[in-house]
């Protein structure tokens, strides 16, 4: 296309967009009162005010405009919630109206948004998938039955760290935790390990997961201006189509191999989640197809690996910076489980300080700082303002966790604040909702609760930790790397010392 023609088309589009933006803003102002917020620039709105770390930028803006704030991101109205009280209004009192999702263009790869528990609108299919996940994956009885597999993975983690300790080898703590999380899930689902410690395959899988999660949070012109979706201007949909294909190829190979085994004379039978889901699919193919199974597996691997490992890395970084708290939880572990190397999941309830450390880590470092965006299905009045239909709702749990009106010394890592508190992470106490709340709460919370506590306990109870090159604990870089998940910008490399 001739450059002059292309330039004219671009100018014409943005001229039209500017007129549309201004007139729509004025017309809406006549019929509804939006929550306060920074005045938007023509066309682009407040996009550039998000910065490199939107959770931090939005928290600063909320100090000026309040806990219920509106912005214009391109052509989309976005409402940001930054306090526990307003979060309760949205996710509890008005849960039904706000239970839908804003679909990022990145999630449309392989039509994932049409089959995903994460992105589906509340519907019969969504309810069926939630029911399957609850009954076949995360029910207490099924998790109890598969604890032996997780115990094996904890022992493998322990043995790997012993080898590193013997050779005085530093480990990338987040990468090590990721490998354990990945094998937790793959062994529970497929009876196989996807990775070995220190292997390239583990890093490759982690890179794929991170790139997909990053695509969901990368500012995307196609999301800000949906009329441009057909162009995929940043190539995000194309990249995700490739990444999803790699994940689906892995799942296809495993599923096909299992189906061949089931159809052969092989009498050996796996007692894992895949077997249960294949049985359910065979008996209810109209309700749960193999295609839906693959999309469900994609959600589970994305949601259950990076989130767990990143939370553990934040927890260990905070404990190394606060050695007196590390010693306190180690003493608790020694008192409760004694000389055992591996903690049992039934021990967690007897370890209140360990639980407090996990809660405090989530308070300061929520793994999904803005949760997954919600969508308003109708105009709703909250705190005297109108949240308009089809607007995007962001719940800034990072801001809620650092709210001085809710927490004493909010910037200080202090697990003690939870020792005599009824606050839990199950979506009932809006001061701490790292897994969300309401009907959209993360279905994997029961498994995450078990794995986080047992993995952290294994690392603390059996090992001391020292930093490389004489680095002091106070020198650990706690800067954030923003994505759909919130990571340490500089990976934590530490040397285990066997106790």
Swiss-Prot record:
Residues with an annotated glycan are: 55, 76, 279, 284
What Enzyme Commission number does this protein have?
1.14.-.-
Q: Name one GO cellular component term.
A: membrane
Question: What UniProt keywords apply to this chain's record, in alphabetical order?
Answer: Glycoprotein, Heme, Iron, Membrane, Metal-binding, Monooxygenase, Oxidoreductase, Transmembrane, Transmembrane helix
The record's Gene3D superfamilies line, in alphabetical order, gives: Cytochrome P450 (1.10.630.10)
Give its localization: Membrane
The way this protein sits in the membrane is described as:
Single-pass membrane protein
Q: Per its record, how is this protein called by name? A: Cytochrome P450 76T24
């Amino acid at each position: 296309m001739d450059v002059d023609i292309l330039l004219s088309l671009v100018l014409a589009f943005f001229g039209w967009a500017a007129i549309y933006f201004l007139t729509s803003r004025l017309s809406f102002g006549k019929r509804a009162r939006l929550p306060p917020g920074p005045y938007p620039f023509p066309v682009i709105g407040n996009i550039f005010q998000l910065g490199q770390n939107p959770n931090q930028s939005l928290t600063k803006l909320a100090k000026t405009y309040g806990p219920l704030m509106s912005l214009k991101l391109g052509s989309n109205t976005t409402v940001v919630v930054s306090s526990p009280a307003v979060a309760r209004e949205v996710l509890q009192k008005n849960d039904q109206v706000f239970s839908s999702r804003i679909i990022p263009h990145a999630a449309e790869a392989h039509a994932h948004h049409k089959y995903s528990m994460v992105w589906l609108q509340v519907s019969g299919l969504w309810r069926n998938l939630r029911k399957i996940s609850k009954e076949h994956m995360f029910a207490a009885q099924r998790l109890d039955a598969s604890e032996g597999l997780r115990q094996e993975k904890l022992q493998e983690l322990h043995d790997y760290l012993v080898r590193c300790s013997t050779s005085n080898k530093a480990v990338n703590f987040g990468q090590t935790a990721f490998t354990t999380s990945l094998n937790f899930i793959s062994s529970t689902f497929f009876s196989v390990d996807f990775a070995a410690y220190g292997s390239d395959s583990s890093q490759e899988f982690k890179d794929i997961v991170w790139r997909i999660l990053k695509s969901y949070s990368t500012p995307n012109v196609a999301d800000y201006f949906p009329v441009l979706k057909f162009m995929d201007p940043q190539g995000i949909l194309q990249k995700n189509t490739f990444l999803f294909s790699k994940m689906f190829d892995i799942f296809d190979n495993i599923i096909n191999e299992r189906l061949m085994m089931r159809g052969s004379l092989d009498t050996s039978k796996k007692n894992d989640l895949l077997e249960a889901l294949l049985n359910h699919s065979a008996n209810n193919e109209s309700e749960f197809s193999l295609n839906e199974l693959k999309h469900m597996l994609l959600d589970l691997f994305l949601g259950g690996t990076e989130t767990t490992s990143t939370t553990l890395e934040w927890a260990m970084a905070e404990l190394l910076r606060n050695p007196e708290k590390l010693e306190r939880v180690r003493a608790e572990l020694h008192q409760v489980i004694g000389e055992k190397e591996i903690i049992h999941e039934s021990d967690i309830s007897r370890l209140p300080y360990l639980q407090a450390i996990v809660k405090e880590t989530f308070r300061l470092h929520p793994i999904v700082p803005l949760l997954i965006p919600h969508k308003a299905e109708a105009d709703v009045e909250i705190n005297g303002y109108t949240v308009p239909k089809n607007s995007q709702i962001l719940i800034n749990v990072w801001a809620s966790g650092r709210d001085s009106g809710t927490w004493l010394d909010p910037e200080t890592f202090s697990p003690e604040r939870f020792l005599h508190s009824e606050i839990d992470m199950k979506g009932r106490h809006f001061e701490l909702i790292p897994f969300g709340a309401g009907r959209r709460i993360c279905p994997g919370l029961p498994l995450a609760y078990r794995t986080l506590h047992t993995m952290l306990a294994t690392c603390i109870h059996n090992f001391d930790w020292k930093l490389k090159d004489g680095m002091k604990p106070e020198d650990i870089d706690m800067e954030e790397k923003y994505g759909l998940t919130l990571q340490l910008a500089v990976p934590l490399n530490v040397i285990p010392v066997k106790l």
